[in-house]
């Protein structure tokens, strides 16, 4: 019966409203998390579990789309490992299902429907009759959706023990906030208890939400507490007006008790009630959903050499393809974050870094580069998954049949394909199963390939009539060129787009360094079937046409398979795929035979195995170790002087020890990830690092969110990076008070105990750091940091260009350069 808490009460059906979908575009102030007791002055914390049980749904309902899963489905596995440290990030899945399937790495995803995020508001008042069984009055009951009346409903009176506690209590002035789960149900009850003039008729504001949102309740407590405070002030206002009316009519005395049950708040105050419900439905609940559904970036430890290699490779590719040797966009942006925003974004919760771009791939690559410079980084150990060695006879026979690959160079291997094997490749990519059947490629009907040596060179037409025997189980993703390399009829079009088809490109294809790009080679995702539709950009972009079909689409028509949507030309312009013979486009080597792995590019992070969900990292091992050290401590664990006081009949033995906790341990992130995320379809105020589409709408959302942040702070700051116009702006917004109508000027005007009003004005300051290829006026410290970043990148380039250097020496030098960048401000 308790499992039906979200069902509406029959007596309140007259005030029911139809279900409304939450609006992700709503923004809520992003402030520190705390739980407070209203009058006792104590502080309470609410700890969420790593994953919790989802709401059980008896029958399927209308599906409610989420923000993250569609985006993650179209991000390559390599980029997932860069951003999140894992290929699989579970969304809203029951913890029992995860445990039964071997932890967090399962491939099943539980659907999210509108009932999962339903909520219920309960306002209950004590009647002041402690000896009476019916000591509670139902003041207000609201739920988001209409549920069938045939289902069992739970009455607010049945929740009195959860809301008010034991009916036998002492007469005190207890006012507090409580968070607890309802037994035998998937619901969380958040309650604030207070009283107006008499302690015998306490009032409770209760919010029931799905238990699936429990892990983010503590982190989003400021938004929930703000809504509870707003509702409490509203109810106190109702009681105050009623008391004034009784005083005017002569019906009020000192012993009179003002009760909400004597006021029909739905009839007399419909506007205030509507504001209360809409604030919860369009601000608080969407905020909880955003924190629960949108995955956060994982910041690798600075001593993890595999990550450092990939990070430098990403910087080299960006400079070669995007910036060129003279632009200096990326070094300046990195210096701005190192010298300023790295500390600001951690100390000032209202500061943000937003990348504006119409290309999700480019924005995510830049997010990966910038996030490595931010704190707090993960300090724990990273598990490296061992590669499975296939020693069965089938694998041996497959290796023997593929010996002809050894004598082929990589550039030639990237031009060999088979249209007859495309169907088998598609099936094997979805199943990841290997078989022993070998199929010879057929040269009849094979499409033409183009060899492209440099971005400014017209592709040379070349036929691929060579036949080669390959296993049908092999992934041929490495031979599928992106849509940018198409038929020779439009080669001149690609020549112009390669040179400068995007405003501000500044000939980024010139002066390339092939040795660096060959040192690391990217690995696109093997996902197919579903296609990601690129967001429409605003006016001003050049219109591009792609009339000719890509190789994958042409071969798909021959094999009667559903083609995958090819990347758009604008994506190639902003960040070209590394698919030329100089740096072949190789698929995920984890699905290739062992012999092919030896000649293919091995992504350094491909074996990273991190158990996590959208918000947290699994720390079960550390928790078990800490629990054992607490239960069975050793003298070495104490690490300080201690004293044992023997117990007696009243208490047990007591051990006292000096508590000397250093800053490194206090700042060590163990579970919760920082509020840094990926490219989103809309700007989200809850995250401090993100990317969103470029345009006036996004900039308007950012400005509005900064104004909302000023409700809880006097200063907010945002770094806006526009990849379309190559623009870096530092926008600051502060609130200055011009008058004071209250003697206490140090008190926050939005504090719940402060009723005074103060006039203030908003002042905005915009500083252009980089605009239209020109560097703005920089401070001396920022100029020094820019020079340091440029010299560090040059040193890293020379390090990776030196093929004769020992691998261990390269690792140590790369770690040293990266550490100097991360700790630049501390060292300086």
From Swiss-Prot:
Role played: Involved in extracellular amino acid uptake. Required for the trafficking of the GAP1 nitrogen-regulated general amino acid permease from the Golgi to the plasma membrane.
Residue ranges, annotated region (Disordered): 1-25, 392-411, 423-444, 538-569
PANTHER family cross-referenced by the UniProt entry: MYND-TYPE DOMAIN-CONTAINING PROTEIN, NF-KAPPA-B-REPRESSING FACTOR-RELATED
Family indicated by similarity: Belongs to the LST4 family.
Ribosomal protein in keyword set: no
Name of this chain's protein: Protein LST4
Taxonomy, superkingdom: Eukaryota
Pfam family, one: Longin_2
Residue span(s) of domain cDENN FNIP1/2-type: 310-712
Disruption phenotype: Sensitive to high hydrostatic pressure (mechanical stress).
PROSITE patterns: DENN_FNIP12 (PS51836)
GO cellular component: cytoplasm; cytosol; FNIP-folliculin RagC/D GAP; vacuolar membrane
Residue positions where Phosphoserine is found in the record: 401
């Amino acid at each position: 019966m308790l499992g039906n808490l979200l069902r509406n009460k029959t007596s309140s059906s007259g005030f029911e409203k139809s279900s409304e979908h939450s609006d992700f575009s709503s923004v809520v102030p992003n402030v520190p998390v705390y739980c407070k007791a209203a009058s006792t002055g104590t502080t309470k914390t609410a700890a969420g579990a790593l994953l919790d049980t989802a709401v059980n749904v008896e029958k399927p309902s209308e599906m409610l789309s989420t923000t993250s899963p569609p985006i993650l489905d179209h991000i390559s596995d390599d980029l997932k490992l860069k951003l999140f440290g894992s290929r699989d990030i579970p969304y809203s899945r029951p913890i029992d299902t995860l445990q039964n399937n071997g932890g967090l790495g399962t491939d099943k995803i539980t659907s999210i429907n509108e009932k999962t995020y339903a909520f219920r508001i309960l306002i209950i008042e004590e009647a002041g009759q402690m000896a009476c069984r019916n000591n509670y009055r139902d003041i207000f009951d609201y739920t988001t959706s209409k549920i069938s009346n045939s289902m069992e409903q739970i009455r607010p009176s049945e929740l009195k023990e959860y809301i008010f506690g034991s009916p036998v209590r002492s007469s005190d002035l207890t006012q507090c906030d409580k968070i607890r789960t309802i037994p035998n149900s998937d619901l969380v009850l958040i309650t604030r208890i207070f009283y107006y003039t008499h302690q015998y008729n306490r009032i409770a504001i209760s919010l029931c939400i799905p238990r699936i949102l429990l892990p983010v309740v503590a982190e989003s407590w400021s938004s929930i507490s703000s809504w509870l405070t707003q509702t409490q002030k509203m109810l106190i206002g109702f009681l105050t007006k009623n008391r004034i009316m009784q005083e005017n009519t002569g019906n009020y005395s000192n012993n009179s008790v003002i009760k909400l049950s004597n006021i029909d708040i739905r009839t007399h105050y419909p506007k205030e009630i509507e504001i209360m419900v809409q604030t919860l439905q369009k601000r608080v609940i969407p905020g909880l959903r955003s924190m629960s559904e949108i995955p956060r970036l994982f910041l690798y430890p600075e001593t993890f050499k595999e990550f450092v290699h990939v990070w430098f490779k990403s910087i080299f590719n960006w400079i070669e393809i995007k910036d060129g040797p003279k632009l200096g966009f990326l070094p300046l942006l990195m210096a701005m974050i190192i010298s300023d925003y790295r500390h600001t974004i951690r100390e000032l919760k209202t500061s943000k870094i937003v990348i504006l771009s119409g290309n999700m791939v480019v924005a995510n690559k830049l997010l990966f580069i910038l996030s490595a410079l931010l704190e707090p980084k993960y300090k724990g150990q990273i598990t490296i998954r061992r590669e499975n060695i296939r020693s069965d006879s089938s694998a041996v026979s497959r290796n023997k049949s593929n010996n002809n690959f050894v004598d082929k160079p990589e550039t030639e291997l990237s031009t060999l394909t088979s249209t007859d094997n495309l169907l088998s490749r598609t099936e094997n990519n979805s199943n990841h199963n290997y078989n022993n059947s070998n199929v010879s490629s057929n040269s009849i009907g094979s499409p033409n390939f183009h060899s492209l040596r440099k971005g400014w060179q017209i592709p040379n037409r070349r036929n691929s009539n060579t036949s080669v025997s390959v296993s049908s189980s092999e992934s041929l993703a490495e031979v599928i060129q992106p849509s940018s390399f198409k038929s020779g009829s439009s080669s001149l079009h690609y020549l112009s787009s390669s040179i400068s088809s995007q405003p501000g490109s500044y000939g980024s294809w010139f002066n390339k360094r092939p040795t660096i790009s060959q040192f690391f080679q990217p690995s696109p995702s093997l996902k197919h079937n579903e296609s990601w539709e690129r967001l429409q950009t605003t006016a001003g972009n050049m219109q591009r046409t792609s009339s000719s079909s890509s190789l994958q689409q042409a071969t798909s028509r021959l094999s009667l398979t559903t083609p995958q949507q090819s990347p758009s030309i604008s994506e190639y312009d902003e960040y070209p795929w590394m698919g030329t013979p100089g740096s072949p486009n190789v698929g995920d080597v984890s699905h290739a035979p062992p012999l092919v792995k030896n000649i293919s590019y091995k992504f350094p992070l491909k074996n990273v195995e991190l158990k996590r969900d959208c918000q947290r990292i699994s720390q079960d091992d550390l928790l078990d170790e800490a629990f054992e050290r607490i239960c069975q401590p050793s003298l070495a664990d104490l690490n300080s002087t201690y004293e044992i006081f023997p117990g007696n009949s009243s208490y047990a033995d007591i051990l006292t020890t000096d508590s000397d906790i250093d800053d490194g341990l206090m700042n060590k992130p163990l579970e919760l990830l920082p509020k840094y995320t990926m490219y989103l379809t809309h700007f989200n105020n809850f995250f401090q690092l993100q990317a969103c589409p470029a345009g006036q709408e996004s900039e308007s959302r950012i400005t509005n969110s900064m104004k909302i942040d000023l409700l809880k702070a006097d200063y907010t700051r945002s770094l806006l990076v526009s990849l379309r116009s190559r623009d870096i702006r530092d926008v600051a917004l502060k609130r200055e008070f011009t008058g004071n109508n209250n003697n206490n000027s140090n008190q926050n005007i939005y504090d719940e105990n402060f009723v005074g009003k103060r006039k203030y004005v908003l002042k905005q300051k915009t500083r252009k750091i980089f605009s239209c290829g020109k560097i703005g006026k920089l401070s001396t410290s920022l100029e020094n940091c820019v020079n340091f970043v440029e010299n560090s990148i040059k040193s890293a380039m020379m390090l990776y260009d030196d093929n004769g250097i020992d691998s261990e020496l390269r690792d140590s030098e790369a770690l040293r350069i990266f550490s100097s960048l991360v700790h630049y401000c501390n060292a300086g």
